[in-house]
Amino acid sequence: MSAVIPPSGPSSAPPAGKIKAIVYFVGFTAALAGLLFGLDVGVISGANEFIQRDFKIDDARVEQIVSALLWGAVFGVLLSGFFSLRLGRRGTILLSALVFAVGSVLCALSPSPGFLTVARFFLGIAVGLAAFVAPLYLSEIAPQRVRGALIAMYQLMITIGIVLAFLSDTFFSTYADLEPLATKLSESVSTLAGGRGQMVMEGYLAMPWRWMLGIIALPAILMFLGMLLLPESPRWLVLKRRGPKALEVLRRLAGTEQEAERELAEIEASLQIEQKGFALFRQNRNFRRAIFLGVGLQVIQQFTGINVIMYYAPRILQEAGFDTTAQQMWGTVLVGTINVLATFIAIAFVDRLGRKPIMYTGFTVMGAGMLSLGAIFHLGLDGGAHDMTMSYLAIASLVIFIIGFAMSAGPIIWILCAEIFPLAGRDFGITCSTATNWTANAIVGMTFLTMLNTLGPGNTFLLYGALNAVFIVVFLALVPETKGVSLESIEKKLLGGARLREIGK
């Protein structure tokens, strides 16, 4: 779900020197931003039921709470260029870690639905900042030989974060005995506050959803402390005319002095290419075509229905006949785990089979999953009693859909968006596509329960299944195959006026 910043082309010089341990520490620490991203996206799925029960709110208000983080992320993405330029990549990640921590605590202590909505919007700003800047930092600081692997680790950490959020939700909703802990903590807080507020605090801390949302502050603090030990991006240092400091950083990270000097020369050469951004968008029709394609790809990714599952899986499982909280939560964990495992299918085959064949397969699998789920609701789950066979078929349909998404649209949409923009407008293009992703994400998040209540579960899932069929036609007509094609070749064909589907092979 976050933008992949493509590494620069391979150097003609042979790889030299051993990869240093600090490189992996840099990769892991920065990838914690992906973990936090996944945690914040996934945690609301299990918290929704408890928030709705404790605040006594309707489905429309739940949609507002879910989508608030996503609108905040749109705002964060739009701010990310400003902050990453002014504060540096490292400084912006530190800022996002602070906002993650503070926002998580504010969400946990929310006294009302309105406060929680605002707190989640604030938290979403951190998600948007991290989603843009963390991959950028990794792409700029990692030695060229391991750059792709470290960015892939960031992407993987997002899916792991979602699973951990589902597991955390399951623990706090089903197995944790919160009342004794709430009593002890509230007594401590009351003592510090002069004996006031113990009953109120105890009531707060006994609510599972507050722990679900608040526990995310811990990895945020860990990321903040880890980032304090890391250097700034050498590319940003060169941009700020601090070349000697950039070389010092590269020496810490590179295997040899020669490798450090070569990377510095490549950075200086790449910065000679002026980023024209919006000016290029206004002036060049062919660049506008690439922007519209990138925006369209992000809308397609979200309208497959993936985040319907990620945000509302327990509710879907409840509609499918899984009545207990434990059943709903463990079903959600299963979905998240499959999402992680199926991502490796794309990693293994994207450069062997190509982008479009995998996407055609993915849309077919996703469409089959959604259509079968809709049919199951119509045939066996809507309007009354049913046996558990239909319920298990429903969760099997969810798993089929998740496999289709994780092996295709999940990673490959981002790969395509990283490849189709010309170098002079790449930053602008990635910003537009990332902001669109979060906007479409928010629209999905704030409409699903309304669709469920208005159209019914069966028709809602049939609609998403039909959309996946339409997306096959869109890919046939508009999307290029970029496997094995250099970025320079794609740019030349695009700016030369070739049809979009022909700018690749």
Q: Residue locations for each model-derived region?
A:
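Short intracellular "coupling" helices and adjacent cytoplasmic loop segments at the cytosolic face
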Residues: 252-263
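Alpha-helical transmembrane bundle of multi-pass membrane proteins
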Residues: 2-245, 249-251, 265, 271-505
